[in-house]
Regions:
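C-terminal outer-membrane beta-barrel translocator/porin domains of Gram-negative envelope proteins
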Residues: 1-86, 96-113, 181-182, 187-191
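Outer-membrane beta-barrel strand-turn architecture
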Residues: 5-9, 86-90, 137-140, 176-178
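Outer-envelope beta-barrel architecture signal
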Residues: 9-15, 76, 90-94, 139-143, ...
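Residues that define the transmembrane beta-barrel architecture of outer-membrane proteins
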Residues: 40-42, 74-78, 124-130, 137-139, ...
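Extracellular loop and loop/strand-boundary signature of outer-membrane beta-barrel proteins
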Residues: 65-70, 115-120, 156-158
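Strand-loop-strand
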Residues: 110-138, 151
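Outer-membrane beta-barrel "beta-signal"
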Residues: 134-143, 163-191
Length: 191
């Protein structure tokens, strides 16, 4: 579902909501790979690397020491975004955006703990990110660049100095553009 609000000739608000549920039937245990859902990346949650979010509270990076091939898939998808688009100069356009969403599993998976969908907790597992983008609109194609960072991760993060208080929380107090470590761990550039 997409909806656009034209504020005036040069400014608009674009919204999008994407949902999906898939279920393997017959003698299949899992949906075909191509039919499974993923979130994260340039056409999804832009503050997270491609296909890196979820399912649920599962955190691939906490268990694996590689970011070479993160490919998280799920049976349920909920994703939305809102973007304020504006003209900067002729073919150059800008956008400020907020993206939110996650994927979940229908069945428990021992290899991906925390991935099963539950009505009483799914809203706590929604990842949220924000950022700024530039668009170069040449009529016959659009070249797009986005820089984004997470405001809320889908998994609990440590909020204490001693490393023992894992909680779902907003990350406003952690934002520090002057820290090279924060930039390395949080800024995501999409093209």
């Amino acid at each position: 579902f997409r909806y656009y609000f034209d504020l005036n000739k040069r400014n608009k608000i674009a919204t999008r909501l994407t949902t999906g549920v898939g279920y393997a039937y017959g003698n299949s245990q899992f949906m075909p790979y191509i039919k499974q859902f993923s979130v994260g990346g340039s056409n999804s949650l832009r503050a997270f690397p491609a296909r890196s979010v979820g399912p649920g509270t599962y955190n691939f990076l906490a268990i694996n020491d590689t970011t070479f091939f993160i490919d998280q898939r799920g049976d349920i998808k909920l994703e939305g975004n809102i973007e304020y688009r504006f003209d900067i100069y002729k073919a150059v356009k800008g956008g400020l955006f907020v993206d939110a969403g996650n994927i979940w599993l229908i069945k428990n998976d021992t290899l991906r703990p925390g991935g099963k969908f539950a009505f009483n907790s799914f809203y706590k597992q929604v990842a949220v990110g924000t950022g700024f983008g530039l668009r170069f609109d040449f009529s016959f194609f659009v070249l797009r660049f986005d820089l984004a960072f997470p405001l809320r991760k889908a998994y609990p993060v440590d909020g204490s100095e001693d490393g023992t208080n894992n909680e779902f929380r907003w990350a406003f107090r952690d934002i520090d553009f002057t820290s090279k470590y924060w930039r390395r761990d949080n800024l995501v550039f999409n093209r």
